[in-house]
Amino acid sequence: MSELLNELELERTEELRAALRALLRRPLLGQAEAPELFRLIRKHEDALRRRANELLGYQLAVRADHARLFRPAWRLDASRPAAVPHKTEPQDRWRPFTSRHYLFLYLVLSLLEERHSLVQLPLTELADLVCRLGVEIGATIDFDQRSERKLFVEVLKWLGHWRVVRVSEGESQDDYVDRGRDGDCLLTVDQGRLASLASAHRPLTEISCAADLIHEGEHAPTDEGRRARVRHTLARRLVEDPVVYVDDLSEEERAYFLAQRPTNLTRSIEEATGLRAEHRVEGSAFVDPDRKLTDTRFPDRGFERQLPLLLCPYLATELEAGRAELTLPQLRGAVRALLERHRAQWSADPDDPDTVDHVTGDALSLLTRMRLVETIPAGVRVLPAVHRYRDPSVRTTRKEET
């Protein structure tokens, strides 16, 4: 009997972990796109809700056909932008939204949120409504321009990725990009998913600046509430960020982190998520052995991921030598040397200054997102986690396009 109970408990633990991992990857998840995972979410709804709240301070809402993990915007963070869905590219390589994308997204969500009766409407009608609302807030929108139509449709595709907006069978939003009003199509709005996606601690129409989005969650103004806020902040950073450095923490956070890191904090995160802790004196990182619970796969295949990886030994060597701050000319020189060394495998021309500038910028952008370097006025400051990649192994079998 005890053996059977152990097996059942192990199965329950694995199912809970799979469900939480699914929600962390895709916080709006439903029956339509992931029936088996949604079944697990429904099965363990109460336990999942407690675990998400106790560990991370997140709230879980489970509806008839979808679940929503609410992750409060507790800081301004530009490292995880919305991005344009692409059918043939992995999500971490989708093109980030521009400010214009966000304008259209704000207008569309505001319109659909205010008009709960809108279930179906032509794309051109939605475009007209967006233009009128744009005028009201002082934004000039011209859908006679193909570039504007393209941005608008890319926002609709992002909403389609979350299954909030669906295009009728046999029609395409891309026709509107190419043909304007002659390329109309019928949109179906899932009002339930829309309400879950757009839910915030205040209505969108009341948000006037980025700071209005900040909402750390509900923590009582007591000693216990303060401790819960510190605990949730640290757990979120450890789960969401590539690495957490001790020097980046407040005094209160640092004291809790150093006291709890070897035991409770690490164990709770590992058991709940399946992530594995890597600790150094300077900080901690939680990595996924399956390489699925991540915003950005690194290392990974492809020139744009291999070159930053091969730059890490140079960065680690400079850091060890006490030269943590590197200028852009130094970095371009290191990139140029790598391009020359791998000329047979990569098509980027090391003799073209514009190419070197572009490749260097892309590499530093990725390394910054991974918290391996941080930007300073003169260039970058190398951070300790770069030592993790000081001896990379890269295999290239053919010449790769850049």
Regions found by a protein language model. Name each.
Residues 56-60, 156-171, 274-278, 364, ...:
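A short, conserved structural fragment
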Residues 108-186:
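Internal, well-ordered domain-core segments that constitute the primary functional module
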